[in-house]
Amino acid sequence: MNKSFWRPFLITAGAIVLVAVLAPLVPARESKVFSIKKLDPIKTLMAPPEVDSAADSLSEKAKQMHIASELQQLEPFLQKLQQQGQNRSGNLRIAFFGDSIIEGDLLTGKLRELLQAQYGGHGVGLVPITSIVHGFRQTIRHEFSRNWETVSFMKRGSDKYPLGMVGYTFIPRTWGYEESVIETEAIPEVLDSLGNVISTGQEASSRKETRRFNVSGPAWVEYSGVKTTGGASEFRRIRLFYSRASANSTVRVSLNGGEQTTYALTPGEGVQMLDLSPATPVTRIRLTFSPTDPIHVFGVSFDDLSGVYVDNFAVRGFSGMYFNAIPAEYMSAFQRYLDYDLVVLQYGGNVSSPKVRDYSRYKKGMTESIRHIQSAMPGVPILVIGVQDRSSKQNGSYQTSPDIPILVQTQSQLAAETGSAFWNLYEAMGGYNSMIGYVNASPRLAAKDYTHFTRAGADKLARMLHKVLTTGKND
């Protein structure tokens, strides 16, 4: 071979050997001008490439923030939650809309407890003026007079009386009303001796009847703190939300059973807020209104200057469609005051029927609801929770209602098409026939109607949802 090749090769090889022999003998030295590190050429050559620690940290965080595809829209919320965990300053708030599944602060109470234990916070959020399950709710003690007119998604006239963020409007009145159930017994057919029908029979039936009655005295509502996880034993920041006050409208406020203080209310349309925060925390507050005042009252918020808050907005029997009953300008006003970081929509059970195979009408209605929320609260992510498994009797035994998988698929589609996140509760429960396991569990996780959850079952769902909201993962 040509000598011109070997000569440079031998020189290079000799230099490498010389460095390998002499380098370990050179002592390490530090000075203000330069530093010499002790070198092990063989170890250096065999070692894996160094990775910048900052880049490595970011990479690890990226792995931790891996978000399931159907939950990608939660990324802004997850980032804010991560910041909240680091500095514990500022508020992070969730508007949790749902049907009877979350009545009495079920699911949301436990979710609030878990989030506040991890990220701070003190208070139950925005609470309505009256509630049909106020005695069942454990996270706040809630009492009120009988002379409030209640308007909701489920009551006609919400176009005349715009609803607030809670899904209700409450108006003080000089009267109240109550519902009673009128039952009619079955009447058998009457036949003559030849078998001819003399009088036709009638099946047993029942109907609801509303009775109106006069009430003397003012309209009032009282809230008290409770020492229950997910609730608050005392109130630190208190804000009243209302609209359509007159020039003479007032509210009288008593703290801890003390003397009443009268506050003038801002007249006019639009959502108004009155800050009633005490100088020091209180355990009880009573608000009193004139029964002839035209004011529309929406609710009272209990929170603090920092922490995570979950507002429970349950309306029994509501499908989730027709959210435009809350005017966009009202929703935008609540957003300015309360600054929601996430809207959760838990619906579907009230449109579910074993006979239905096409939910396109429901899809259209829910899409309109989501678009309405998005226009009123731009940039706020929305999480659609799919309908739970529910069972109906088929061939003598309970099985998953045949429409449930179809409804879940429809909800997944409408979430994707509206840019919303989607959590498949049916799948999280275990899928087909999982409700049967919830009913038969010990302790029981669901009621024997094979639709609703017990408190223990709701707590189980809250833990699953907590993982979804804090990790962005379904598994």
Regions found by a protein language model. Give the residues of each.
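Active-site-proximal beta-strand/loop segments in catalytic clefts of secreted hydrolases
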Residues: F97-S100, N312-G317, L345-N350, I385-D389, ...
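Conserved, well-ordered alpha-helix/loop/beta-strand core segments that scaffold catalytic motifs
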Residues: L342-G348, T367-Q374, P381-G386, R390, ...
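Conserved SGNH/GDSL esterase-like catalytic core that processes O-acyl groups on lipids
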Residues: E103-S254, E259, A264-K364, H452-F453
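Catalytic His-Asp segment of secreted/periplasmic serine-dependent ester chemistry enzymes
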Residues: P327-A328, D389-D475
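Membrane/wall-proximal cationic-aromatic binding patches
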Residues: M46-F96, V151-G157, L163-R173, A204, ...
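Hydrophobic membrane-insertion alpha-helices, especially the h-region
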Residues: F9-L25
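Alpha-helical scaffolding within the catalytic cores
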Residues: S69-Q83, F323-Q335, K364-H372, V408, ...
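Solvent-exposed, polar/charged alpha-helical surfaces in well-ordered, non-transmembrane soluble domains
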Residues: E75, Q79, D105, G109, ...
